[in-house]
Swiss-Prot record:
The keyword Transport does not apply. This is Translocation and assembly module subunit TamB. InterPro entries: TamB. Component of the translocation and assembly module (TAM), which facilitates the insertion and assembly of specific beta-barrel proteins into the outer membrane. In addition, is involved in outer membrane lipid homeostasis. Likely transports phospholipids between the inner membrane and the outer membrane. Interacts with TamA to form the translocation and assembly module (TAM). Belongs to the TamB family. Disruption phenotype: Significantly reduced survival in human serum, probably due to complement-mediated killing. It comes from Salmonella typhimurium (strain SL1344).
Length: 1259
């Protein structure tokens, strides 16, 4: 074999072995595992926990990768490739899933990267794939990426795509739980702080006019060729839920739907639907990135941002970007505005026609209107190089008189000429003509004219008539300005006082002023300013001579006179002042006399004196007799004394000091200081040493103490307050008796507090100050008067603490009640300026509710034990709570309770942003089971639900109502609505309503309730609306005894409440009953109450007939009541039918008009019946006096057999009844004894004797 053949054979064998090795490593499961094992071993920082499966079902778990500045942790990566597709020249990925991925990148720790080389332009990008690529499913679950201070989290993402040639299709995609936390701009700016530079205009810098001229000399939209996108993209459906971006602003998108496609430059937006916390957006449209770039976009939005909450926006964009573009905007809601605009972006000069129209614009947008503009019309037409502007509107407001505003102007890129701005108001006109030019510097020239202004109608207490003119001109350039007022003139009168203002002045930004003369005169009062504040010389005089300020302005009074002079030079100025005022008053403030006198010079040192004396300062709750301030000396040695005499504060202080100009340092001493305050006198125990160093911007305050009879506050060591420093404050004693002047009479507090505060700060470093505050109470007792009864609360231990260290704030407390339980806990906030994570715990141990028993009446009490072990979590925006709160052995006995409560319990379990409620309310008869849950995972959209179920719970409202209820109700609560639904069964009830007093009268429907200020009370409405939908079922054993009616009730009512109010729907029936009226015993034959709306307006359908046993001739006579409760209609009826007079006779007498009985006997029987009917309560009270219960006087029988019957209970189960005939002397004695609740033994003795056994049925 030749050498060439050997070499060729060796190369061939090597290639075959290499290809076989690659095929083994890549194409087999074993080889693939070997590749990952090698990577796990040889790749620095890589660690793979587990590898299973092959290319068809490959799973990598517990992957870690770490490099400087980069840390990656992956829980699981799954890849499934369809190898069969390779035979069809396509690539198919059946599944690509990433789960529990955490990536942390710190760019500061990463090695610097090499500068990127500039890539040469290679023409338009064209993306195309030679083989079809299909990704059936890509899924991301629990992905967290942090890059420096930016965090991106994805809860769940699923999608898929198909790519063939240039066509890329994104399959239906779902994204849930996206959070992008951006750093706040202030934090970034603080890290990248740069010393500001003041840039002065450069000689070659273009003026604003030239810049605008160059801008509009060419089209705003440059010449553009057709745009060819590298891909044809089709997004079939992209749905997002709970997408949130935080930072300087917080944006939460609840739901989002996007459908869009782009084919050969033709873009089509089928659907864009966004529902966010700031509002909703719906958009659709088309656009073409070629030819003239036509567009057609429609957008509709509803805002949910104060004050534009509820504002609806409709935007329409049409036309073409390179031809005429038309934009229309309609706003409706709190602000109604219509805007129409046409422009040509591809034409030089930017042609623009803009029109804004609004019938009404008000501010604020919600609530009471303070400003309003009606019929607003604004129009701008032309080009930016030559345009006209006009505006018309009428305005009014709370403090603004009605006015009509007219504006006409012309302008170009160099200037705007305000032809006329007219404000027609107050019976006159205010006109402004001006020219503003920015071709070189920004300069202006204008004239303001007042003509015929009259305020008599708008301000009748301060009428004024004014005319005037002011001319002004000036310029602004490079941060400096200058202004010249060549003419200022104002004439007229104010409340019969002549007004005269005239003068001229000029000045600049260097505070150099030349004032030839300014004169102000109002009636006899005048003020003059004249002089110059020049570059070197200072010579300015100001004088005031106001002998009659009374009513010159509303609420102003008194007199004032004085002069102020400025002399010297800029390097050595001198200020002299001498001002005197007497009888000054402004609104409710009055000063009897004031004097200011001073002479201050500044040469190499500032020296002089200043004396201020103010006598009798008075206003509500303030009465100061005298205030004096004396300051004198020089920089090297000066002193100040302040004296105050009066109420509520009086006292004095003395301050001495010296200033070193070279060192820019002031040293002083505060001494002889004491004040009298409403909480007692305060005085310094030692002088305070003060030291201010201006170069360091730091002040030192020496140790001292403030002493009060009930308190002592001390600074034990020197405080250096500057950019950095530390302060320690000790509260050695604080008696709560000091608070008595500020507490209501119903509250009393006693005890001693002591504490300490230690705070340090350093503004040159990032983060918050450091500090700790502790407060401890001894013998603390608070007594609150509730319902004229004292409620004392004594504290055995009362400790409070607050700590701020290492970017963590902590608040702790320990409260032990005397002879009671304990309440303690701590709340921690980590990173208060950033994430504000919460931590800590709250504990309650054996808190006994018996502590409130003193406020209960005799025989009433409360019992129960409250315990809680709670733990805080989450952050301030989304707080979390864990643990349990339990109220056990709860028992409240009181007349206000509708049932007799037995020991009950209530338990609440908290698990993060959710909680559950379980409880049992036990009563003497029956119990109520409570269950519920709450969720505050969305703090602005929390919800709570409580269900109550019970069986025959006895409810008692003495002395009228006893009933059994079986509730099955559900109460739901959200921030916007309370809802009560369910059913309440009343199987048994006894309702007894006593007669109203004869003097009782109903409340008039037009009554108006007044408050303490004699103003009508505003009806209180619930801040959150309440909707109810309850069904009340009245069972077969419900009886009522009210106003002579004894009856049984049945029926069903539906109780509904909404924003319209409370309403009842349903029917109450009266199956049987009796009604005592007019001395007669009427039987309810038919009774129906129909409810359909307000509860006080039922429809009545009632028939009550006379007892047939007491009516002759088998006649049925009665009363029929129909109509509404407020307008009932009553009529008498009979069976058989007969005239009304005959029916009335049978109703009242029990017999007809043609009866053989004498009229006197009939009249006697009727009158006795009527009299007995009116004396029932009087007889009952007499019986109670003699120990006979339920003593009653009644009539029985008809005609000659009528009797007067007296009955009563002499023993709890023994009833005695005695009857005497009205027209004969026959008497009947009846004894009835109750053997069992419904079994009676009755003995009757009269003309006949009888012994009966009676049993009572109810059906």
């Amino acid at each position: 074999m030749s050498l060439w053949k050997k070499i060729s054979l060796g190369v061939l064998i090597f290639i075959v072995v290499l290809l076989a090795s690659v095929a083994f490593l890549v194409g087999t499961t074993t080889g693939l595992h070997l590749v990952f094992s090698a990577a796990n071993r040889w790749v620095p920082g890589l660690e793979i926990g587990q590898v299973t499966g092959g290319w068809r079902d490959l799973s990598l778990k517990n992957i870690r990768y770490e490099q400087p500045g980069v840390a990656v942790n992956a829980g699981e990566i799954h890849l499934a490739i369809g190898l069969d597709c390779l035979w069809r020249s396509s690539l198919c990925v059946n599944d690509l899933a990433l789960k529990d991925i955490n990536v942390a990148i710190d760019s500061k720790k990463m090695p610097p990267s090499e500068p990127a080389q500039e890539e040469e332009e290679s023409g338009p990008l064209n993306l195309s794939t030679p083989w079809p690529i299909t990704l059936s499913r890509v899924a991301l679950n629990n992905i967290n990426i942090k890059i420096d201070d930016t965090t991106v989290s994805v809860l769940d993402f699923t999608s898929g795509l198909a790519w063939q040639e240039k066509n890329l299709t994104l399959k239906p995609t779902r994204l849930q739980g996206l959070l992008i936390a951006l750093p706040k701009v202030a934090d970034v700016a603080q890290e990248e702080v740069v010393e500001p530079k003041i840039e002065k205009p450069q000689p070659d810098e273009k003026p604003l006019g030239e810049t605008l001229k160059d801008l509009f000399a060419k089209p705003v939209m440059p010449e553009m060729t057709d745009v060819h996108l590298p891909l044809n993209l089709n997004i079939e459906s992209f749905r997002g839920e709970q997408l949130r971006i935080t930072g300087d602003t917080d944006l939460t998108v609840r739901t989002m739907l996007l459908k869009v496609s782009s084919i050969d430059g033709n873009m089509k937006l089928d659907t864009l639907d966004i529902d966010a916390n700031q509002g909703t957006v719906k958009a659709s449209g088309t656009a073409q990135l070629a030819n003239n770039w036509p567009v057609d976009i429609t957008l509709n939005s509803t805002l949910n941002i104060d004050p534009l909450k509820g504002e609806k926006i409709k935007l329409k964009v049409g036309g073409a970007l390179r031809e005429q573009l038309e934009v229309g905007v309609n706003l409706s809601g709190p602000m109604d505005v219509a805007l129409r605009a046409q422009t040509r972006l591809a034409e030089a000069g930017l042609p623009l026609n803009l029109e804004v129209v609004s019938q009404r614009i008000a501010w604020p947008l919600t609530g009471d209107t303070q400003f309003q503009a009606d019929d607003l019309k604004l129009k701008l037409s032309g080009k930016m190089t030559d345009y006209t502007l006009s505006m018309r509107t009428a305005v009014k407001g709370q403090d603004i008189p009605p006015a009509t505003i007219t504006l006409d102007a012309k302008g170009n890129e160099r200037q705007i000429n305000l032809d006329k701005l007219t404000v027609a108001a107050l019976e006159g006109k205010t006109e402004l003509k001006a020219l503003v030019d920015w071709q070189q510097a920004i300069s202006w020239r204008g004239e303001l004219t007042l003509n015929g202004i009259n305020t008599a109608k708008e301000i009748p207490d301060w009428p004024a008539k004014l005319n005037g003119v002011m001319k002004t001109k000036g310029s602004l350039y490079g941060g400096t300005w200058q202004m010249d007022v060549p003419e200022l003139k104002l004439t007229g009168n104010v409340k019969q006082n002549s007004v005269n203002v005239n003068g001229t002045l000029k000045g600049n930004s260097y505070m150099q002023w030349t004032i030839p003369g300014l004169h102000f005169a109002l009636g006899p009062n005048s003020a003059d300013i004249k002089g110059e504040l020049g570059v070197k010389e200072l010579n300015l005089d100001a004088a005031i001579d106001a002998p009659g300020l009374d009513n010159a302005l509303p609420g102003l009074g008194g007199m004032a006179k004085g002069i102020v002079k400025v002399r010297g030079t800029v390097e050595a100025p001198q200020l002299l002042a001498d001002i005197t005022a007497r009888g000054l008053r402004w609104q409710e403030l009055s000063v009897a006399q004031a004097r200011i006198e001073g002479d201050i010079k500044s040469t190499d040192q500032i020296a002089g004196h200043l004396n201020v004396r103010v006598e009798r300062i008075s206003q509500p709750d303030v009465n100061i007799n005298l205030v004096t301030l004396d300051a004198k000396g020089s920089e090297k040695q000066h002193q100040l004394q302040l004296r105050v005499q009066g109420e509520p504060v009086s006292g004095q202080l003395s301050l001495t000091g010296s200033f070193d100009r070279e060192a820019a340092r002031w040293k002083g001493t505060l001494s002889d200081t004491r004040f009298q305050t409403p909480v007692g006198p305060w005085s310094l125990t030692r002088a305070i040493a003060l030291d201010y160093r201006n170069k360091e911007q730091k002040i030192s305050i020496g140790p001292h103490c403030w002493l009060n009879p009930n308190a002592e506050l001390c600074i034990p060591q020197t405080i250096d307050a500057g950019a950095a420093g530390r302060a320690v404050v000790n509260l050695n004693r604080f008696d709560l008796a000091m608070l008595k002047p500020f507490m209501p009479d119903t509250t009393q507090a006693s005890g001693i507090f002591s504490g300490k505060a230690d705070v340090s700060w350093d503004t040159t470093q990032e983060g918050l100050p450091q500090g700790k505050v502790t407060l401890s109470g001894r013998n603390v007792k608070v007594t609150q008067t509730v319902n004229d009864a004292p409620l004392p609360v004594a504290f055995e231990t009362l400790n409070l603490s607050a700590d701020l260290h290492n970017n963590r704030a902590e608040l702790g407390w320990l409260i032990r009640l005397t002879n009671n339980g304990q309440f303690d806990g701590q709340v921690q906030v980590t990173d208060p300026q950033g994430r504000r994570n919460l931590g800590g715990n709250v504990n309650m141990r054996n808190l006994n509710l018996a502590m409130v028993n003193p406020v209960f009446s005799r025989g009433e009490k409360a019992a129960g034990m409250l315990n809680a072990r709670l733990r805080l979590g989450g952050d301030v925006q989304s707080p979390q709570l864990f643990g349990q709160l339990q109220l056990s052995a709860l028992d409240i006995d009181g007349n206000f309770m509708p049932f007799e409560m037995q020991p009950s319990q209530l338990t609440m379990n908290f698990s993060g942003t959710r909680s559950t409620l379980a409880g049992i309310v036990r009563t003497q008869q029956g119990q109520i089971n409570l269950n519920g849950n709450a969720d505050w995972s969305q703090i602005d959209n929390w919800r709570a639900r409580v269900t109550a179920k019970g069986s025959r719970v006895r409810i008692t409202v003495p002395p009228m109502v006893r009933l059994d209820v079986s509730p099955d109700v559900v109460f739901d609560a959200t921030p916007s609505l309370f809802t009560l639904d369910g059913r309440v069964d009343v199987p048994w009830a006894r309702i007894v309503v006593h007669d109203l007093p004869e003097s009782a009268v109903g409340v008039s429907s037009d009554v108006v309730m007044l408050n303490n200020d004699l103003q009508p009370e505003t009806p209180q409405t619930a801040s959150i609306p309440i909707n109810s939908n309850l069904t009340v079922h009245v069972g077969n054993n419900v009886r009522i005894d009210a106003f002579g009616l004894k009856a049984r009730l049945t029926g069903d009512l539906k109780v509904a409440q909404d924003k319209q109010g409370l309403g009842l729907n349903g029917q109450i029936n009266i199956p049987d009953g009796r009604f005592r009226a007019y001395g007669q015993d009427l039987l309810v034959r038919k009774g129906e109450l129909l409810f359909s709306g307000p509860p006080d307006q039922p429809l009545l359908n009632i028939e009550a007939i006379r007892n047939p046993d007491a009516t002759e001739d088998d006649v049925i006579a009665g009363v029929r009541v129909t109509g509404t409760a407020d307008e009932p209609k009553a009529e008498i009826f009979s069976d058989p039918a007969m005239p009304q007079a005959e029916a009335l006779s049978y109703l009242l007498r029990g017999q007809g008009l043609d009866s053989n009985q004498s009229d006197s006997a009939a009249m006697t029987s009727m009158l006795i019946g009527l009299g007995v009917a009116q004396s029932g309560q009087v007889v009952g009270k007499i019986g109670e006096t003699f120990g006979v219960s339920n003593l009653a006087l009644d009539t029985q029988g008809v005609g000659d057999s009528s009797q007067v019957v007296v009955s009563g209970y002499v023993l709890p189960g023994l009833q005695v009844k005695y009857g005497v005939g009205i027209f004969d002397s026959l008497a009947t004695l009846t004894l009835r004894y109750r053997l069992m609740p419904k079994l009676y033994l009755e003995a009757v003795s009269g003309v006949d004797q009888a012994l009966d056994l009676l049993y009572q049925f109810e059906f």
